Amino acid sequence: MNKYTKPLNTTSLVNTYKAARKRLFLFDYDGTLTPIVNNPADAQPTSALLHCLQLLCKDPANTTWVISGRDQLFLDTYLGSKIPRLGLSAEHGSFMKKADIYDWTDMLKDADMSWKEKALAIFEKYTQSNPGTVIEQKKSSITWHYRNASDIQKTYVCVCVYMCF
């Protein structure tokens, strides 16, 4: 038995795509549609990416979504305002915006977010003592970026933060 994924049969894929009456495309943003970069603000969509998404969204048989850890403003600015019929999911599903709808739906409107204060205090402690690390606050989450820290710091800090939680 082969334990590896078989190569994609592109002929079969194209035939299945053409025969389908409805198609669903779900794309992640960072690391999928755009490469992982040292500064998250630099991960802006290319004109080629926007063109591909526009082509997918123009086909009425397609339902296309971008699901991201990015916030609503970023997704609206770089994708939603440029591509009709594109659904958006911000902050890993915390906020949803159906295609061609102006308003976002807050999926966490009744959630207890009191945990953020304690988590932020822990992240601030480690950020101060670890050069190259930064805190990114969003409405529904706090992300601690350590990709620009040294490799030794990354390992040490990950273990320390894990022990805190």
Predicted features by range, described:
Residues 16-17, 122-126, 164:
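Residues that form generic nucleotide/phosphate-binding pockets
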Residues 1-29, 34-37, 41, 48, ...:
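Non-catalytic pre-domain segments flanking phosphatase-related domains
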Residues 27-32, 91-93, 99, 138-139, ...:
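Short loop/turn segments at strand-loop or loop-helix junctions that form parts
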Residues 41, 98, 154:
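Short acidic, gly/pro-rich beta-turn/loop elements at beta-sheet edges
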Residues 129-165:
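Conserved acidic, metal-coordinating active-site core of Asp-based
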Residues 9, 115, 119, 156-158:
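Alpha-helical structural motif
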Residues 44-137:
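Active-site phosphate-binding/coordination module
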Residues 23, 86, 142:
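Residue-level detector of short, conserved catalytic/binding motifs and their immediate flanks
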